[in-house]
């Protein structure tokens, strides 16, 4: 087995290609470090799927729609749960009294354009804390008829405490008698992603085929634990990237997935920089992740 090492991730530069999607994290805007070509990473579709299935902050907006109760433009607030169907549609659990629920019920079979925006924030305090944003645009409809039990089961699996009815509950329209919640379906037409790895467009078909990263459910807890209890050991990882003046740097765990751990080093004269530490092999569960992190620490100690 080869000795683990870190891969420094230099800051991005604005692309000279006018057709390339501009990043919200360009150097002159955010100073967000970016990767070199060839670094092991999840695909864009996997990263979007992971964000959709995560607890990251989300907003649902109906561009140009107007609430029949208040004659101004509205956003709908935050869905309390969300998941993705095998066909790639996004199922949202929202308040039955929300503007989105009322608008979808009123639209019937008309196209109702909607936008989901997901903002991913690092769970530890670090410069440039926003790790990424995903934007999914499509058409919003109520979940009706025979689709309701299957969608309710998917949401219940994602958020068991969300107060969903049994999957075999009554299939009548969810907007009768002002229920506490309702399910909406977003048929995705366009996806854009801007995160630590770069800015790109993702095809809706790729989202349907992708799986969320298995470490996403554990990432927040593990990063916070590493930061609080193992800050000194994280600092030793700087030796694996050959950085000068390592004794003056502070190491903050920024992100992890099944392929590796990303550390942001701060306090240097040149400003913060990131390093990516690949695991010897992809990890599938928490036990494998602990072994992989231990391997990194052991390599840094020798």
Give residue ranges: language-model regions.
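A general structural signal for short secondary-structure junctions and capping/turn motifs
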Residues: 49-52, 82, 105-108, 126-127, ...
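Short, surface-exposed beta-edge/turn micro-motifs
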Residues: 55-58, 87-89, 111-113, 180-183, ...
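Short, structured beta-strand-loop surface elements
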Residues: 87-88, 96-162, 271-274
């Amino acid at each position: 087995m080869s000795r683990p090492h870190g891969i420094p991730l230099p800051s991005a530069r604005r692309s000279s290609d006018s057709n390339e999607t501009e990043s919200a994290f360009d150097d002159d805007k955010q100073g967000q470090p970016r990767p070199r070509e060839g670094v092991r990473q999840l695909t864009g579709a996997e990263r979007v799927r992971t964000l959709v299935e995560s607890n990251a902050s989300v907003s649902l907006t109906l561009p140009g729609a107007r609430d029949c109760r208040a004659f101004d433009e509205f956003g709908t607030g935050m869905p309390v749960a969300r998941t993705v169907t095998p066909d790639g549609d996004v199922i949202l659990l929202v308040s039955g009294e929300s503007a989105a629920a009322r608008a979808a019920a009123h639209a019937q079979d008309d196209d109702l354009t909607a936008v989901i925006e997901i903002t991913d924030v690092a769970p530890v305090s670090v410069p440039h804390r926003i790790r990424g944003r995903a934007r999914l645009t499509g058409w919003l409809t109520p979940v009706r008829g025979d689709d309701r039990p299957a969608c309710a089961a998917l949401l219940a699996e994602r958020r068991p405490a969300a107060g969903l009815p049994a999957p075999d509950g009554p299939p009548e329209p969810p907007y009768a008698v002002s229920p506490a919640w309702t399910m909406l379906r977003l048929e995705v037409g366009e996806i854009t992603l801007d995160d630590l790895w770069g800015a790109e467009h993702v095809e809706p078909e790729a989202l349907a085929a992708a799986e969320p990263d298995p470490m996403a459910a554990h990432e927040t807890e593990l990063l916070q634990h590493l930061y609080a209890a193992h800050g000194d050991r994280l600092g030793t990882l700087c030796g694996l990237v050959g950085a000068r003046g390592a004794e003056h740097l502070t190491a903050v765990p920024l992100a992890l997935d099944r392929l590796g751990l990303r550390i942001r080093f701060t306090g240097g004269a040149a400003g913060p920089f990131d390093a990516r530490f690949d695991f010897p092999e992809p990890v599938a569960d928490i036990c494998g992740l602990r072994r992989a992190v231990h391997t990194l620490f052991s390599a840094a100690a020798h």
